[in-house]
């Protein structure tokens, strides 16, 4: 590797990975509830293991949803439909342990500190406080059209295409569990120049050879996802490097909601506040705050105000207004952090109810985000991925 160059690696997983099964179940339950009760409070956690799904959490709603049916339908859609896979949508046990949201938390969400203290400016917006304290990050970079880091973008692309090859029976020996990983080499100007390493581990039928899998992935997977200009004779490929991946899914590993937070975001390229997304209604700023931060970051880069930017927002439980906003452009902007923050504060409402209204989050849009990443999804119409405020932001800041 040339002097002053460096490598960066990100990974993704398929929708059949145990942790992603759990995420998708949690978000499918959330979608089912808020489609009938948009104001419901949902904090839904799922764990999956051999032959068993446990759904637990705190849900406050006036509607009924058939949780066991949602669980089975989700597992079936993912592809675990045969007992020989070690996990079967029809025969697995489904247990539920659901409580209501704590009244101590509810009182701060139902009526924010600003509202309770008589300091509200906009009663409807100030009325909802943050559902918890915490810090969230949003990130954007101009190294891809989707304004995402290249390593995670390619890792997601491989995982998504691999799933497509399985579900369309193009490669009918594939089974649901899979992981992908991409290592990108960056030059001295921090621009991606080549792919150094690709790792794919995919569950498969016991009778298929590893040689056949490798041949098929080089034919049907890699050319469909990765621009050939990034590949060279030194690019390394590791395909099922253990030599066998028959036992997978919940039979191989237990899965839990919220255990793939780096896969869900930027692949480690940006910092993470620690809060997971799936199973949480939009009053939970772990989710809505991170979406809003991405929305802000993406519009900053789309406006040409920076080439790369990380936005942090932080909240106190029961308080509507963020306790802090910070913006780091890594030296790629001609504008000060304060100029950017002033523009963001004028154009983006980062109070929980403001975010919910701005991004129209009280809708059943979450199940589709629970695999292959929440950001950079050109295959989905996600409100936090829009750049509709870029021009207005540019006019505010560029004098």
Swiss-Prot record:
Residue span of region Flexible loop: 101-111
Location of this chain's protein in the cell: Cytoplasm
Reported cofactor(s): Mg(2+); K(+)
Pfam family membership, one: S-AdoMet_synt_M
Keyword Cytoplasm: yes
Family per record: Belongs to the AdoMet synthase family.
Catalysed transformations (reactions): L-methionine + ATP + H2O = S-adenosyl-L-methionine + phosphate + diphosphate
Chain sites annotated for binding K(+): 45
Protein name: S-adenosylmethionine synthase
Segments crossing the lipid bilayer: none
Cofactor mode of binding and number, as noted: Binds 2 divalent ions per subunit. Binds 1 potassium ion per subunit.
Biological or metabolic pathway of the protein: Amino-acid biosynthesis; S-adenosyl-L-methionine biosynthesis; S-adenosyl-L-methionine from L-methionine: step 1/1
Entry keyword Aminoacyl-tRNA synthetase: no
Main location: cytoplasm
Oligomeric form and interacting partners: Homotetramer; dimer of dimers.
Single GO MF annotation: methionine adenosyltransferase activity
Free-text function comment from the UniProt entry: Catalyzes the formation of S-adenosylmethionine (AdoMet) from methionine and ATP. The overall synthetic reaction is composed of two sequential steps, AdoMet formation and the subsequent tripolyphosphate hydrolysis which occurs prior to release of AdoMet from the enzyme.
Enzyme Commission designation: 2.5.1.6
Key words of the record: ATP-binding, Cytoplasm, Magnesium, Metal-binding, Nucleotide-binding, One-carbon metabolism, Potassium, Transferase
Residues reported to bind Mg(2+): 19
InterPro entries linked to this entry: ADOMET_SYNTHASE_CS (IPR022631), S-AdoMet_synt_C (IPR022630), S-AdoMet_synt_central (IPR022629), S-AdoMet_synt_N (IPR022628), S-AdoMet_synthetase (IPR002133), S-AdoMet_synthetase_sfam (IPR022636)
Residues engaged in binding L-methionine: 58, 101, 253, 284
Origin superkingdom: Bacteria
One GO CC annotation: cytoplasm
């Amino acid at each position: 590797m040339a002097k002053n160059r460096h490598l960066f690696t990100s990974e993704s997983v398929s929708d059949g990975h145990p942790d992603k099964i759990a995420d998708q179940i949690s978000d499918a339950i959330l979608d089912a509830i808020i489609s009938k009760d948009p104001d419901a409070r949902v904090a839904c956690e799922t764990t999956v293991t051999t032959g068993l799904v446990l759904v637990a959490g705190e849900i406050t709603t006036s509607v009924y949803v058939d949780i066991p049916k949602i669980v089975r339908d989700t597992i079936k859609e993912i592809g675990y439909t045969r007992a020989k896979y070690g996990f079967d949508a029809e025969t697995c046990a489904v247990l539920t342990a659901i409580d209501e949201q704590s009244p101590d938390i509810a009182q701060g969400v139902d009526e924010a500190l600003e509202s309770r203290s008589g300091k509200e400016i906009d009663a409807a917006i100030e009325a909802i406080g943050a559902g918890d304290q915490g810090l969230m990050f949003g990130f954007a970079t101009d190294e891809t059209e989707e304004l995402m880091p290249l390593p995670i973008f390619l890792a997601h692309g491989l995982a998504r295409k691999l799933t497509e090859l399985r579900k369309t029976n193009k490669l009918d020996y594939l089974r649901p569990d899979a992981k992908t990983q991409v290592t990108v080499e960056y030059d001295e100007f921090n621009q991606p120049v080549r792919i150094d390493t690709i790792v794919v581990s995919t569950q498969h039928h016991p009778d298929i050879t590893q040689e056949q899998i490798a041949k098929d992935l080089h034919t049907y997977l890699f050319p469909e996802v990765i621009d050939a200009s990034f590949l060279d004779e030194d690019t390394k490929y590791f395909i099922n490097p253990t030599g066998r991946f028959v036992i997978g899914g919940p039979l191989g590993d237990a899965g839990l909601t919220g255990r793939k937070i780096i896969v869900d975001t930027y692949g480690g390229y940006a910092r993470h506040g620690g809060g997971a997304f799936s199973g949480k209604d939009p009053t939970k700023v772990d989710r809505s705050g991170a979406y809003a931060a991405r929305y802000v970051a993406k519009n900053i880069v789309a406006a040409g105000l920076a080439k790369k930017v990380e936005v942090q927002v932080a909240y106190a439980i029961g308080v509507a207004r963020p306790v802090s906003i910070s913006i780091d452009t890594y030296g790629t902007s001609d504008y000060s952090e304060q100029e950017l923050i002033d523009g963001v504060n004028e154009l983006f409402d980062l109070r929980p109810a403001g975010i919910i209204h701005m991004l129209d989050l009280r809708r059943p849009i979450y199940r589709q985000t629970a695999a292959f990443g929440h950001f950079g999804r050109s295959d989905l119409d996600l409100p936090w991925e829009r750049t509709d405020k870029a021009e207005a932001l540019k006019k505010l800041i560029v004098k």
